[in-house]
């Protein structure tokens, strides 16, 4: 069957290892597929429902993803209660919080980990996470990823139009007259400033 990489809920990717191959063979195929520009700069979920990996093996996967400007958002296992985020530069494992609704003005969500919002973030709504923030809708509110100082955190949205966007200690705002985004975008830190690119 071979190692698979496929879209889950945009903009994340699902990486499913081939249990019929050795871990080293999976790593080789993963790097080969990630070398395609299509997958670079993505956020990924690694499916471990068919096999178990040691912390050292997880770190090797994360190292390859980092090489191609990608990042592990979390690990999916057969036991959903054990799904944990395991990033090599984070000493404490953190989980993914899923919000299945639109956040309206005045609402506030804070979480020590990654936040996935299936809905919009309206103006004057606040989202604060120590990890990544992904919005499956339009982001018009105030967001702060990497709130504990994690400069590798990213913010992604199908339409990125925030009142205020912060990653770690870096801050930016949308222009007053900003055109409607035509594609999903991500915000990240590079060279001590926030960049916004299409996905």
Curated annotation (Swiss-Prot):
Organism of derivation: Persephonella marina (strain DSM 14350 / EX-H1)
InterPro entries: CAP/MinC_C, MinC, MinC_C_sf, MinC_N, Septum_form_inhib_MinC_C
Biological process annotations from GO: cell morphogenesis; division septum assembly; regulation of cell division; regulation of cell septum assembly
Coiled coil stretches, renumbered: none
Keyword annotations: Cell cycle, Cell division, Septation
SUPFAM superfamilies in UniProt: Cell-division inhibitor MinC, C-terminal domain
Pfam families hit by this protein: MinC_C, MinC_N
Gene for this chain: minC
Family: Belongs to the MinC family.
Function: Cell division inhibitor that blocks the formation of polar Z ring septums. Rapidly oscillates between the poles of the cell to destabilize FtsZ filaments that have formed before they mature into polar Z rings. Prevents FtsZ polymerization.
Protein name, UniProt field: Probable septum site-determining protein MinC
Chain ranges passing through the membrane: none
Subunit and interaction comment: Interacts with MinD and FtsZ.
